[in-house]
């Protein structure tokens, strides 16, 4: 596995740190609620994504191969949820005085990982590419899960900090509204990549 660590790390860096549903929602939460109130969301993404990769690794990938409709259903359900989330973000009533819209909880974010089309696709690709059956199966599996865990931490912290940094410019309601619209549009743009 050692020669593939660099390739796996690069793959996880690009897929984890590029804009996607988790990162956009994390940035939005960092912007509107700050770092401390976003910690449950961050932990939900980190542990949910890692758990999902482990579950795909230890059997779900075979279920997807036998019954592709399950994967398609997950992607469709995740798409519907993203549209709902984009709507909620876009039309949230937030002002510089009072930031309503409660932060996303640990459980909500943890459970969303199993509906997150980008995350499911990343899990399937990483497991099918970097985990081999045989004597080293467990070793390869632990490497993939460990690298995914590390990059989930790096990515989510980075995006929350971007949101927090942007909040310094939120001196009026118009800026906040524009930021929320931008986050909504980015979230909706993620959907197109699920069907390419």
For every predicted segment, state its role.
Residues 53-57, 115-127, 185-196:
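Hydrophobic alpha-helical transmembrane segments in multi-pass integral membrane proteins
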Residues 2-65, 69-72, 125-144:
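Juxtamembrane transmembrane-helix termini in multi-pass membrane transport proteins
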Residues 91-104:
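Flexible cytoplasmic inter-helical loops of multi-pass small-molecule transporters
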Residues 65-94, 152-155, 159-162, 167-196:
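Selective transmembrane alpha-helices of multi-pass membrane proteins
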Residues 13, 17, 50-51, 87, ...:
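Hydrophobic/aromatic residues within the transmembrane alpha-helices of Major Facilitator Superfamily
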Residues 44-48, 110-121, 180-183:
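Select subsegments of transmembrane alpha-helices in polytopic membrane proteins
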């Amino acid at each position: 596995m050692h020669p593939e660590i660099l390739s796996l790390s690069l793959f996880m860096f690009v897929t984890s740190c590029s804009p996607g549903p988790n990162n956009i929602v994390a940035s939005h939460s960092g912007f509107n609620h700050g770092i401390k109130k976003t910690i449950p969301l961050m932990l939900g993404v980190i542990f949910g994504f890692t758990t999902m990769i482990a579950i795909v690794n230890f059997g779900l990938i075979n279920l997807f191969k036998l019954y592709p409709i399950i994967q398609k259903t997950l992607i469709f359900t995740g798409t519907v949820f993203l549209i709902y989330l984009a709507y909620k973000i876009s039309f949230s009533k937030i002002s510089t005085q009072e930031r309503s819209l409660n932060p996303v909880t640990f459980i909500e974010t943890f459970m969303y990982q199993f509906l997150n089309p980008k995350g499911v696709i990343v899990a399937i690709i990483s497991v099918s590419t970097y985990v081999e059956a045989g004597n080293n199966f467990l070793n390869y599996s632990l490497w993939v899960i460990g690298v995914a865990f590390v990059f989930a931490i790096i990515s989510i912290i980075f995006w929350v900090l971007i949101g927090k940094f942007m909040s310094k410019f939120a001196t009026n309601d118009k800026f906040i509204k524009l930021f929320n619209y931008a986050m909504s549009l980015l979230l909706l743009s993620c959907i197109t990549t699920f069907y390419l």
